[in-house]
């Protein structure tokens, strides 16, 4: 693309807002749509152009990015009567950055091809901080030629950007990410509560362990929030449960053993039943403190 393409962005949540902000700062004309316009007001003030419906974004953008909540939302946004596949211009690039079903990503890819559209599945990891700082890890599935055209856009939003394979490969890679995090969050929560119950200062304990063999993104970024009782969402409990459900379904189809994932999903479901579904995933520590 010689000129900067016009971007469309559907879904302005915790991470989507920061991603759009970075795209605007990078000089991209960006059209946006989300269910609640009030959530987009700050971005509109910063230069984003509001569109009343998804079909308007699709009809007027060269590259359409989606970052919605659940696979059913992805299906509606792409395949519905007012969706992207029915209204996008031929040769547009469609990038779904929602964590969603690998099978749905493959379905969207096939639908897109039949309409001379080019689809990538590109879920992300890095949370609210990674989105704000443009340091997301982006896991991409799709064709190399399309990926290369979209790469300058990805580079505004992330730093670790890898084409993992054909359609669906990005979503499968994100499932690997979520499976690893699922058990890790149990360990991080247990470690913090152990330190507290042993009468230690958990902050200084963290200084000792985070740079050693126990180190992880969750330990460095979420354990401090656990210690200071900051449970606002960088990533929602309800969305993590959704991700683990998708991962378990995919793993079952492959005949895998997933005891850690199953336990983590159950614990997070218990947490959600206590009214924490809109909290950040670090709220898991509450289960261990209250035991």
Label each PLM-derived region with a short phrase:
Residues 1-66, 97-98, 128:
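NAD(P)+-binding Rossmann beta1-loop-alpha1 motif at the extreme N-terminus of oxidoreductases
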Residues 171, 215-279, 291:
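Interdomain hinge/lid region at the active-site interface
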Residues 35-36, 70, 143:
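Residues in the short beta-alpha loop(s) of Rossmann-like NAD(P)-binding domains
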Residues 100-178:
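Rossmann-fold dinucleotide-binding core
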Residues 19-20, 39, 108, 153, ...:
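Hydrophobic residues within alpha-helices
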Residues 54-117:
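Rossmann-fold NAD(P) dinucleotide-binding segment
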Residues 66, 134, 138-141, 162, ...:
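Active-site-proximal catalytic alpha-helix in oxidoreductases
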């Amino acid at each position: 693309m010689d000129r900067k393409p016009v971007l469309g962005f559907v879904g302005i949540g915790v991470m989507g807002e920061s991603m759009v902000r970075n795209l605007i700062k990078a000089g991209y004309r960006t059209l946006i749509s989300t269910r609640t316009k009030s959530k987009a007001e700050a971005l509109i003030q910063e230069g984003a152009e509001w569109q009343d419906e998804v079909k308007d974004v699709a009809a007027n953008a060269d590259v359409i990015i989606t970052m919605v909540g659940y696979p059913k939302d992805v299906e509606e946004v792409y395949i519905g009567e007012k969706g992207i596949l029915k209204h996008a211009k031929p040769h547009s690039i469609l990038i779904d950055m929602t964590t969603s079903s690998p099978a749905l990503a493959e379905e969207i890819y096939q639908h897109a091809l039949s309409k001379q559209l080019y689809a990538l599945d590109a879920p992300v990891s890095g949370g609210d901080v990674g989105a704000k700082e443009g340091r997301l890890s982006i896991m991409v599935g799709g064709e190399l030629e399309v990926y290369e055209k979209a790469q300058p856009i990805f580079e505004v939003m992330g730093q670790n950007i890898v084409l993992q394979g054909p359609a669906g490969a990005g979503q499968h890679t994100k499932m690997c990410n979520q499976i690893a995090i699922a058990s890790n969050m149990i360990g991080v929560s247990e470690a913090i509560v152990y330190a507290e119950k042993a009468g230690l200062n958990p902050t200084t304990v963290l200084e000792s362990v985070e740079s050693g063999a126990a180190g992880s993104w969750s330990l460095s970024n979420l354990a401090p929030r656990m210690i200071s009782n900051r449970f606002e969402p960088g990533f929602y409990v309800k969305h993590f449960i959704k991700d683990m459900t998708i991962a378990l379904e995919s793993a079952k189809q492959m005949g895998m053993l997933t005891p850690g994932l199953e336990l983590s999903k159950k614990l997070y479901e218990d947490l959600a039943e206590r009214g924490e579904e809109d909290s950040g995933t670090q709220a898991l520590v509450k289960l261990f403190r209250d035991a």
